[in-house]
């Protein structure tokens, strides 16, 4: 009986520690991603939208195939890590991030560097770099702009050279970008966004993932509509005030990617 009680206490202790670690992971990821959102002039719901859609797409992918042998833990970590996909934008000039017009070729090349900056930031986290969450986040940061036909950046990866985590987030990120208003464009409708993605206007994605995304498009539409309704309730004053606070803080520095990235 004493042995059983001791085992129960140990199990409870380990469970509590795991829960606390995962909670802390989510808190830190949320803080970092919110900094990027507000600096980039976004509503604050961008990361929440990316999280939800990534989780939904992963769930459908696992239902449809066991090709990637994704466990529940894999799905959870990819979903959490998806929030950090654009963290490298911390190192991009705000004038480029929030430019109301089309970027020049030179500006676009600088913007593309956010993928390498984000990966470099995470790779420098010596204490945590062996953590699976950090490794997945690094993959997503660097490769969420790669395309299945090799036409993406920064490394021109093709097909299954692109980690599945990055492939999932790439579709979700494009959909979110299309259906969200930006300083340089209005939001596209769900229907138009789906058309653009499926016809390859935004690059080539893996056919299986496109099928999965089509399968869940009604759920995606609902989540996106809820996001739009929430955004309508956020005042411009609140967003401007938060951006000014972050601008004056010491959390945003001039980060440069390493030359070999």
Question: Which stretches of residues belong to each language-model region?
Answer:
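Histidine- and acidic-residue-rich, metal-dependent catalytic cores
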Residues: 23-261
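Amphipathic, heptad-repeat alpha-helical coiled-coil "signal-transmission/dimerization" linkers
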Residues: 1-18, 22-36
